[in-house]
Amino acid sequence: MNLFNLDRFRFEKRSKIEEAPEAAPQPSQPGPSSPISLSAEEENAEGEVSRANTPDSDVTEKTEDSSVPEPPDNESKASLSCFQNQRTIQEYIDLSSDSEDVSPNCSSTVQEKKFSKDTVIIVSEPSEDEESHDLPSATRRNDISELEDLSELEDLKDAKLQTLKELFPQRSDSDLLKLIDSTSTMDGAIAAALLKFGDAGGGPRKRKLSSSSEAYEEDEANDDQSLKKPRGDRREESNESAEASSNWEKQESIVLKLQKEFPNFDKQELREVLKEHEWMYTEALESLKVFAEDQDVQCASQSEVTNGKEVARNQNYSKNAAKIKMKQKISMKPQNGFNKKRKKNVFNPKKAVEDSEYDSGSDAGSSLDEDYSSCEEVMEDGYKGKILHFLQDASIGELTLIPKCSQKKAQKIIELRPFNNWETLFTKMSKINGLSEDLIWNCKTVIQERDVVIRLMNKCEDISNKLTKQVTMLTGNGGGWNIEQPSLLNQSLSLKPYQKVGLNWLALVHKHGLNGILADEMGLGKTIQAIAFLAYLFQEGNKGPHLIVVPASTIDNWLREVNLWCPTLNVLCYYGSQEERKQIRFNIHNKYEDYNVIVTTYNCAISSSDDRSLFRRLKLNYAIFDEGHMLKNMGSIRYQHLMTINARNRLLLTGTPVQNNLLELMSLLNFVMPHMFSSSTSEIRRMFSSKTKPADEQSIYEKERIAHAKQIIKPFILRRVKEEVLKLLPPKKDQIELCAMSEKQEQLYSGLFNRLKKSINNLEKNTEMCNVMMQLRKMANHPLLHRQYYTAEKLKEMSQLMLKEPTHCEANPDLIFEDMEVMTDFELHVLCKQYQHINSYQLDMDLILDSGKFRTLGCILSELKQKGDRVVLFSQFTMMLDILEVLLKHHQHRYLRLDGKTQISERIHLIDEFNTDMDIFVFLLSTKAGGLGINLTSANVVILHDIDCNPYNDKQAEDRCHRVGQTKEVLVIKLISQGTIEESMLKINQQKLKLEQDMTTVDEADEGSMPADIATLLKTSMGL
């Protein structure tokens, strides 16, 4: 029996039963309930009709003598008639959750007794006769008006029958239908059934014996209190009960209406969805439609539902699989933070894992939400062995994965080894201060998380084997898997061989219903491969619409490339101000625009609720995300918003799939294949979130993690590097320039370091630690990024002189001084150049050029200019670019500049100007704005004035030059201030790059064996 009905029919009173129970009573915890009237003065002698809060499976089969006999018709009618005429006595039983007297019990029999003539049995819901006499006709008309037609009445009747069958499984449908026909409400039908059949559960149950005569007297007092209740209160409670019944009928009608649209899901599932949306039909319908389209679970159309009867359909998924996926889908919404009205989490994502298709039936698939902290829990022998083996052999890194196990505790566990048996383990763990038995039970969590990852690995391995088998089979048959360049592409342009392999790989994963990550190294033409794939889909009849989400700096390049390579595709640019986007949305909704592809930016896609709503409602076929590493954080708001885009398939394009750790890679996989990974995100987060270490410091476990990650990503990612596919591409040479700081700069850096070192012990927040690191980085780059030369005395003088300026004549000098205090030396220098009265406070050129990196950079630029090379110069800081402009002007070098403040419309013109005007020597770029999707192959030297904490941002910058179309050898120069924090940053970056190498290196196969790499197989199949 479901909990909804279980809680509605619970009774509060207890009293004595004339016969002792044959079985010991078992207490049950009270739950919330709604009021219903059903009592009599002699109820204690008759036995209480009660329900235990247990599932149906726990209720024993009902015996013949376990029911309370129905009173004679004449007595029952006389009682009700008396109540209708006088309406002076009405008894209500309080079923509130505060009652502590309710204690349903199981028993074998209930003694049969006849109701006395004085007994009055009153239910809160009126019978049909009572309704016809006492209730106004308007009420009946309102009740009937809630059901729109006869089919809805029949469906409601079916719902009532189903509910009664759950409560009274031993009764026939005909008996239950008679009760439904004889009453007008659900509560009335159940109350009548309780009177006629007795215990609803179908199992022999008895009232619990009162422990003392005081309990009986208390019940009698409660009865008297109830009998004396004022008529107004009784009517109010009766109205509340009727209203509750009416609400239930409304809700059931909504459930039935929703089930017509989604015949695959049972009513209980739909009820829970409606609860999620506050019983709002339209919102629940929209949510389920989005889910159904995403899952290919079809909903019933108008033609498929006739006369309220569901028509059977062929489904792509089984009913159980659809339920599980719906649970996973809905359980994700509160995590994404969109369902703000939600009060409680109906679905448990952990339980979804337990019920998923990966469940092997072993203990490894059980829910992780169980409580393992109880030392009295009986552990299975299999888990005992696993836990013992884990604690015996695990490394410190593995032990720290145990909940509440710190590094120190892990070290203590290692010192306690060996653990020969289970008893020894408990004894040793209990004796050591700081350790407890809880750590032993918590090991089960780690083991289960490993099992989840192993199941994912096995699933991914099966997918990979299927792809490999198909390509191998096609190759063996001589047909091969070779999709030629689509005819829609510009015939004057041709795909390179490795790009054809990429196109074939995209077509292969699409055929198998998978999503993928095209992770070719920067500069190999991922944009062109994606456009070719859209052209292939167009030829196959899939004309969209598709969505391409790109960084703002590359939107012009994408529009240009699509128009160049495949002019047949109609492209709609969703970009501009809020008003412009509003007009575009209006055109889309009213179908004024004819388009196959929508191109937009990450910001425009999710910046407002209207933007997000558009892409939730649009039925997109493919959503392509350029620079997909922007989705590396599954906890970010951007990630959560983009997950709501309603696209049947997803494709990520990224040149750097692995950046800081394996968790970022798993975030990308979860984004493209949410139905496979979303139910396991917590396990994935814990297993792959640890920091990387150098190869010589990696434990066996850390190497296993890398192997596991490689196994999981194998079917979904295609990664080629330039050295593999571009034999003719000129080489790239890396050069590290250690720059000695100037004498003054070294003094300032040392003083800053000592000051920060003294205060670092008081810092607790990571944000403050990051600020310390940033201050050191700025000083290592240039002293003018701090305020050193403009002392407080100078600033006071300058603030007074500023009053002579026409724009500041009425200003407050104290406020001017406060503003100047937070400015850097270079900002104050620019301010002095701007205002005449403080012009004399400008810094000398020697101070501006007083930097160790500037001295080295000046020499390098002079040499490169003599050779005829052209330079792309990157910096993390826009203010550093300002100072670099002074340097370039001082040495009379022509340059262009592009940073985050440059308008999107101007960027493409600056790039074209640099690529066509060979007299421009230097292109100044900020690493973030100029490191994505820009082609600068006309330059052959890349200088990184200051490196990024993320080496892949630097790699993106490097590959602006080292890409397809480059004809010269590319030189990459990194400027590192010697003896500063930048040396440590360089070392950490090298470790991160090693992780990518470990992940992308293909394991060497045995000699003569078939290569397992899909790309290699495709290449062989295509004869390349």
Curated annotation (Swiss-Prot):
<feature type="modified residue" description="Phosphothreonine">
    <location>
        <position position="54"/>
    </location>
</feature>
<feature type="modified residue" description="N-acetylmethionine">
    <location>
        <position position="1"/>
    </location>
</feature>
<dbReference type="GO" id="GO:0005654">
    <property type="term" value="C:nucleoplasm"/>
</dbReference>
<keyword id="KW-0378">Hydrolase</keyword>
<feature type="modified residue" description="Phosphoserine">
    <location>
        <position position="238"/>
    </location>
</feature>
<feature type="region of interest" description="Disordered">
    <location>
        <begin position="1"/>
        <end position="83"/>
    </location>
</feature>
<dbReference type="InterPro" id="IPR003892">
    <property type="entry name" value="CUE"/>
</dbReference>
<keyword id="KW-0067">ATP-binding</keyword>
<feature type="cross-link" description="Glycyl lysine isopeptide (Lys-Gly) (interchain with G-Cter in SUMO2)">
    <location>
        <position position="994"/>
    </location>
</feature>
<feature type="cross-link" description="Glycyl lysine isopeptide (Lys-Gly) (interchain with G-Cter in SUMO2)">
    <location>
        <position position="469"/>
    </location>
</feature>
<keyword id="KW-0238">DNA-binding</keyword>
<dbReference type="GO" id="GO:0003677">
    <property type="term" value="F:DNA binding"/>
</dbReference>
<feature type="binding site">
    <location>
        <begin position="895"/>
        <end position="902"/>
    </location>
    <ligand>
        <name>ATP</name>
    </ligand>
</feature>
<dbReference type="InterPro" id="IPR001650">
    <property type="entry name" value="Helicase_C-like"/>
</dbReference>
<comment type="similarity">
    <text>Belongs to the SNF2/RAD54 helicase family.</text>
</comment>
<dbReference type="GO" id="GO:0000018">
    <property type="term" value="P:regulation of DNA recombination"/>
</dbReference>
<feature type="modified residue" description="Phosphoserine">
    <location>
        <position position="132"/>
    </location>
</feature>
<keyword id="KW-0597">Phosphoprotein</keyword>
<keyword id="KW-1017">Isopeptide bond</keyword>
<feature type="short sequence motif" description="DEGH box">
    <location>
        <begin position="626"/>
        <end position="629"/>
    </location>
</feature>
<dbReference type="GO" id="GO:0000792">
    <property type="term" value="C:heterochromatin"/>
</dbReference>
<dbReference type="GO" id="GO:0000729">
    <property type="term" value="P:DNA double-strand break processing"/>
</dbReference>
<feature type="modified residue" description="Phosphoserine">
    <location>
        <position position="210"/>
    </location>
</feature>
<feature type="cross-link" description="Glycyl lysine isopeptide (Lys-Gly) (interchain with G-Cter in SUMO2)">
    <location>
        <position position="722"/>
    </location>
</feature>
<feature type="modified residue" description="Phosphoserine">
    <location>
        <position position="79"/>
    </location>
</feature>
<keyword id="KW-0234">DNA repair</keyword>
<feature type="domain" description="Helicase C-terminal">
    <location>
        <begin position="856"/>
        <end position="1008"/>
    </location>
</feature>
<dbReference type="GO" id="GO:0000785">
    <property type="term" value="C:chromatin"/>
</dbReference>
<dbReference type="GO" id="GO:0006338">
    <property type="term" value="P:chromatin remodeling"/>
</dbReference>
<keyword id="KW-0539">Nucleus</keyword>
<feature type="short sequence motif" description="DEAD box">
    <location>
        <begin position="1003"/>
        <end position="1006"/>
    </location>
</feature>
<feature type="modified residue" description="Phosphotyrosine">
    <location>
        <position position="216"/>
    </location>
</feature>
<keyword id="KW-0832">Ubl conjugation</keyword>
<feature type="compositionally biased region" description="Basic and acidic residues">
    <location>
        <begin position="7"/>
        <end position="19"/>
    </location>
</feature>
<keyword id="KW-0677">Repeat</keyword>
<feature type="modified residue" description="Phosphoserine">
    <location>
        <position position="213"/>
    </location>
</feature>
<keyword id="KW-0007">Acetylation</keyword>
<feature type="modified residue" description="Phosphoserine">
    <location>
        <position position="124"/>
    </location>
</feature>
<dbReference type="InterPro" id="IPR038718">
    <property type="entry name" value="SNF2-like_sf"/>
</dbReference>
<dbReference type="InterPro" id="IPR014001">
    <property type="entry name" value="Helicase_ATP-bd"/>
</dbReference>
<keyword id="KW-0227">DNA damage</keyword>
<dbReference type="GO" id="GO:0043130">
    <property type="term" value="F:ubiquitin binding"/>
</dbReference>
